[in-house]
Amino acid sequence: MIVRNTRHTALRLATLTVALLAVLGLVAACTKSSDAKQSDAPLPDAKTVIDASAASARALHDVQLDLSVDGSVPNLPVKSVAAYLTNQPKVSGQGDAEVTFNGTQVKAKFVVVDAHLWAQFGSGQAYQDMGLAADIYDASAILDPEKGIAKLLSSVRDPKVEGREQIGGTDAVRISGIIPGTALAGIVPKAALGDRPLTFWVQEAAPNNLVRANVGFDNGTLSVTLSDWGKKVALLDPKTAK
């Protein structure tokens, strides 16, 4: 009797195992089929994607920015920025930056409020008012619809969709093109730049947010990555924060 029950148990386990493997195989096949359909689908029209992305950028009020420089970029005193940016109810931002200040490379936390840049140069220290953000580097200008990422996108010449990629878990289309230096004013202020090669990634699904942009320079590359579009964050009060 014990032998029979053991055999029945083994048979049930074997049956369940086969069924489970069949289900897993079906799921895997469906996943591969879905992935294949997406990768085999025709690439979208570059202008259509760019127009939609520029419209989203103009309507964007909150975003997480990660900016980095590999090499050097003319007139840009920044090596890296990781920050939350907003333009409502007014232009503000906060985060961490590595910048050149008075000829020295320094790391600092910063807050931009009322057009002033406040910086903290060590944990527990008080924030110092460094003056007008525009006189140093105002990353929050990236959300300015007239000179930020919206301007960059709408100014791209000779755009070409090159393929699909995932950036930070977001399905995006990769587009290359040329960007005039004047369209970089919100990212590289005070720079007299000529045309620059640009590669950027736009969320393939609506609302087609800009995910990343790489701008080539003679001696370096500027990379801007955006995420958490529309997600609002509470700003610090630099007068009391430590």
Protein language model regions, located:
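Subset-of-secretome marker
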Residues: 2-5, 31-242
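Bacterial N-terminal signal peptides that target proteins for export
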Residues: 2-18
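C-terminal motif of bacterial Sec signal peptides marking the signal peptidase cleavage site
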Residues: 26-29
